[in-house]
Amino acid sequence: MKKIASILVTAVAPFNDHAANRGEKLLGNASSVKRRPDGRVYVSGQMQRHVLFSAIERLNAMDPKRGDTYVANGDGISTDIAKDLRSDLGGFLSTSKGDYSGRRIAPISATPAVARAKSKVGHDLLIRLKMNEEESKQKQALAVNEFSQADDMIMNFHLDIGAVGVTKKFEYNKEESHVATHYEQHINDDEHLRRVKLFLEASRSMTDYANQARNAVSGEPRQVLIVLDPGMSRKAIRYFEEGTSSIEQEAILKELQARGAQYFIGDDTTDEYSSVYEAYMQAIDAVQNGKLYRPS
């Protein structure tokens, strides 16, 4: 059995009446829904990572095997990858080390979540009630708020398994030529497996988007393709895209099989495939019983 070197999750989640990632103030004094030039709304990759790490934090807090691990706040990331999951899985750039900047490339990467089709954007008129006329001489405050009516959002996450819990160190000779690379492991195999499973679990637990008090949405998938890959590929992120034909979908799956990758398809809208829940359980079981790549 080939070792699993990376995991790709590509999923479709329905968002209704949402403002999951407002952006520029195109309407004056209220934020507008982020959307592309083609009219499709999107949630930025930064927001997707925020929601994913929020899910990882909750899952880790409930895990009796978490030990002294934690997920640091986004504004206070440490460089302790043995304990800080955001530092390990999310990477960091530390500029407080004198002439040297500590830099860690994130094992987790995410794409923006993009609507499959052109979005229909609605507008709410907001009025700030002036209860006491003596309080302010300004005119009554009016604002327009945008929301998107209904979108099937395609989102993608990728994990470089070999980079989890490890730092890469370079050896140079007197001429300052790079002559060797060494890997330092900061966690044992059990903790490595636990963090990989946390990533998978978090990708189906996406809820902490913006504006959840008034425009709550769920990023939990309706359709999903999970790839346990012996290599490093993100080609399968095209699987659910609107322009991908059934022929191309079949070609993607055949290529995965030819490379020795395992894949799991979940679809809650048909009985042709397993449900999303079943697909995740199958993938987690395969990770649990498989061999994960760790550089040495």
Language-model features, listed with the residues they occupy:
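RNA-binding basic/glycine-rich loop and surface signature characteristic of RAMP-family CRISPR effectors
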Residues: 1-296
